[in-house]
């Protein structure tokens, strides 16, 4: 149907639809183009236009055989295996200075709406990534083009309000291999896209599997770096995510960090080995505990400051009988109102009514 049956046609896609063909788009301009026009992200499109899917792993014939090519090819045609290295070379200079101000002109595959795309709940956390702090006007196609330069992707979607299409500012990107997901975190985490600094990390599954894996660490050296934090805590397990808290004005470390491990046992081992231990270059023993315990202690301290009794406090004494009567029979009435009521209702037996 889409083959090169017309002698004057330039469609050499081997049976694939023409580049940019979108059956579900109904002819809208967004679905009819395989590349992003300048300023495209400023246009308003419906959620149907911005949500799309790509061929599943079972339907692909090769690494880069998406319709319309794959990867970021600025000024070049994506889609060949030889072009992957060039695409990465095009991306790395942009990320070296933590700036990616413009994503227009990227080579993208055609897309269409797919309501059956299942994201983080069915995929391994070793390949599924969560991308936070996305620009409000960033589209799924831009996000796909950005991450497709790293490697082949199973699914890619920005989470939106299903009625209005409003972006919630985060997305899930699922790679086909663990190596590509690791490289995506290393290359794309922290880059700036339209004045927004992206945060790329593994998407964590819900439930019991992630309980007691996040550590709250204090008394770290004020010169601590990410590499030094990896050296200290990486001995005890696989670190999924880490965050050194910094002063908002100076940008220097505050001596506090969060470290999340892949398994609960790894976090417990780190607590046993590092709590009350002075690290290299430090002057105080570390305080390492579960982040949940820190949150509970902080909440209890705040509640005590504002005068809210704790959960273990004894219950207040019961009200006196006249107040109980007032609350049960004539709630909100004054004593005069009660007397007036009794005069106008001489046969009303309050005790019997109660």
UniProtKB/Swiss-Prot annotation:
Q: In which tissues is it expressed?
A: The embryo-specific isoform is not expressed in the pole cells, which are the progenitors of the germline.
Report the subcellular localization.
Nucleus; Cytoplasm
Organism encoding this protein: Drosophila subobscura
Kindly state which keywords UniProt assigns to this record, in alphabetical order: Cytoplasm, Differentiation, Nucleus, Repeat, RNA-binding, Sexual differentiation, Transcription, Transcription regulation
Chain ranges of the RRM domain:
127-205, 213-293
Instruction: Extract the PANTHER family matched here.
Output: OS02G0815200 PROTEIN, RRM DOMAIN-CONTAINING PROTEIN
- What residue spans carry the region label Disordered? 1-20
GO CC annotations, alphabetized: cytoplasm; nucleus; ribonucleoprotein complex
What this protein is called in its record is Protein sex-lethal
What SMART domains does this protein's entry cite? RRM
Cysteines joined through disulfide linkages: none
Gene Ontology biological process terms from the UniProt entry = alternative mRNA splicing, via spliceosome; cell differentiation; sex determination; sex differentiation
What is known about its subunit structure?
Part of a complex containing fl(2)d, Sxl and vir. Interacts with nito. Interacts with Unr; cooperates with Sxl to prevent translation of msl-2 transcripts. Interacts with how; promoting nuclear retention of msl-2 transcripts.
Q: Which PROSITE patterns match?
A: RRM
What NCBIfam families is this protein classified in? sex-lethal
């Amino acid at each position: 149907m889409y083959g090169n049956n017309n002698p004057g046609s330039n469609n050499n896609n081997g049976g694939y639809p023409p580049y940019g063909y979108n059956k579900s788009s109904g002819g809208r301009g967004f679905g009819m183009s395989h590349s992003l026009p300048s300023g495209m992200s400023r246009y308003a499109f419906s959620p149907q236009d911005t949500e799309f899917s790509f061929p599943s792993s079972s339907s692909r014939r090769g690494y880069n055989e998406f319709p319309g090519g794959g990867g970021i090819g600025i000024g070049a045609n994506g889609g060949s295996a030889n072009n992957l290295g060039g695409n990465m070379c095009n991306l790395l200079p942009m990320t070296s200075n933590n700036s990616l101000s413009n994503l227009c002109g990227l080579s993208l595959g055609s897309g269409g709406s797919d309501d059956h795309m299942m994201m983080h709940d069915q995929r391994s956390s070793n390949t599924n990534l969560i991308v936070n702090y996305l620009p409000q006007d960033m589209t799924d196609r831009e996000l796909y083009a950005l991450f497709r330069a790293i490697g082949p992707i199973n699914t890619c979607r920005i989470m939106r309000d299903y009625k209005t299409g409003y972006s919630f500012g985060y997305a899930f990107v699922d790679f086909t291999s663990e190596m590509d997901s690791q490289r995506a975190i290393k290359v794309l985490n922290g880059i700036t896209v339209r004045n927004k600094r992206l945060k790329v990390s593994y998407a964590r599954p819900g439930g019991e599997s992630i309980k007691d894996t996040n550590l709250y660490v204090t008394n770290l050296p004020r010169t601590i770096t990410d590499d030094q934090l990896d050296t200290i805590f990486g001995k005890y397990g696989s670190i999924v995510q880490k965050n050194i808290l910094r002063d908002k004005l100076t940008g220097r470390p505050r001596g506090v960090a969060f470290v999340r491990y892949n398994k609960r046992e790894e976090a417990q081992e780190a607590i046993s080995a590092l709590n009350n231990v002075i690290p290299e270059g430090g002057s105080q023993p570390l305080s390492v505990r579960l982040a949940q315990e820190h949150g509970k202690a902080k909440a209890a301290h705040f509640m005590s400051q504002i005068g809210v009794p704790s959960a273990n406090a004894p219950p207040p004494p019961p009200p006196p009988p006249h107040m109980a009567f007032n609350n049960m029979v004539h709630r909100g009435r004054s004593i005069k109102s009660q007397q007036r009521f009794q005069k106008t209702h001489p046969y009303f037996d309050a005790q019997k009514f109660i």
